């Protein structure tokens, strides 16, 4: 349904939280981050704590929106509530980490970073069929590899699989791919942030 597609797109737009996280930990962009460089606590501790707080906060919001859709709007989105909540948690974690990655490598201004996020997320959503229903089928026919690495397609396919398949193999592949991509983006973001910190000293 249109509501469920909007919800899946919203899971990716939580990347905004990751962009703010990156800015707040870049000494060349934020006075707060500059103060952190001389704080006794390790920079890694700040980053982990803020990332965890962002994930918890955004996950609560996304879960609340999900429960509103299924309980109030009465739109069926899954037959496996527990796994659906896991999907939301993994999707939110990926999105925030993705936003942090874009915040680390993107333009210097916050507006530029936000623009980069929209310029990246919207094509992902389009190719996954969240903007035009049959697009994912077209991509699957002509370039299936895109559906295997497109985060929007993986999130959408996770919910689709929970609704339509008894086997969890495809669902597990989607979730594990998202987790792997999250880990890679986090490592790269941490290294870039650390390099910027050293450069600012």
Regions found by a protein language model. Give the residues of each.
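Membrane-spanning alpha-helical segments of multipass transporters and channels
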Residues: 79-201
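Transmembrane helix boundary and interhelical loop/hinge segments in multi-pass membrane proteins
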Residues: 18-39, 43
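Membrane-interface helix termini and inter-helical loops of multi-pass transporters
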Residues: 70-78
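Short alpha-helical transmembrane interface motifs in multi-pass membrane proteins
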Residues: 12-17, 49-50, 79-87
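Selective transmembrane-helix segments that form parts of the transport pathway or gating/packing helices
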Residues: 42-69, 84-85, 89, 93, ...
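Hydrophobic transmembrane alpha-helices and immediately adjacent juxtamembrane helices
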Residues: 38-39, 44, 196-201
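Short, small-residue-biased leader/transition segments that mark boundaries at the very start
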Residues: 2-7
């Amino acid at each position: 349904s249109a509501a469920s597609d909007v919800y899946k797109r919203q899971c990716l737009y939580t990347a905004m939280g990751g962009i703010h996280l990156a800015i707040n930990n870049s000494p060349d962009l934020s006075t707060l981050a500059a103060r952190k460089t001389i704080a006794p606590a390790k920079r890694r501790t700040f980053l982990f704590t803020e990332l965890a707080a962002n994930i918890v906060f955004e996950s609560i919001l996304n879960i609340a929106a999900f429960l509103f859709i299924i309980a109030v709007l009465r739109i069926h989105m899954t037959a496996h509530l527990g796994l659906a909540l896991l999907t939301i948690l993994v999707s939110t974690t990926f999105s925030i980490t993705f936003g942090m990655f874009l915040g680390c490598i993107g333009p210097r201004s916050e507006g530029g970073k936000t623009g980069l996020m929209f310029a990246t997320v919207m094509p992902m959503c389009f190719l996954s069929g969240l903007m035009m229903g049959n697009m994912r089928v077209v991509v699957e026919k002509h370039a299936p590899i895109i559906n295997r690495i497109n985060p929007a397609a993986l999130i959408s396919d996770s919910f689709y699989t929970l609704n339509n398949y008894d086997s969890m193999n495809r669902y597990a592949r989607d979730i594990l791919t998202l987790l792997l991509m999250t880990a890679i983006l986090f490592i790269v973001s941490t290294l870039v942030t650390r390099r910027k910190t050293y450069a600012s000293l």
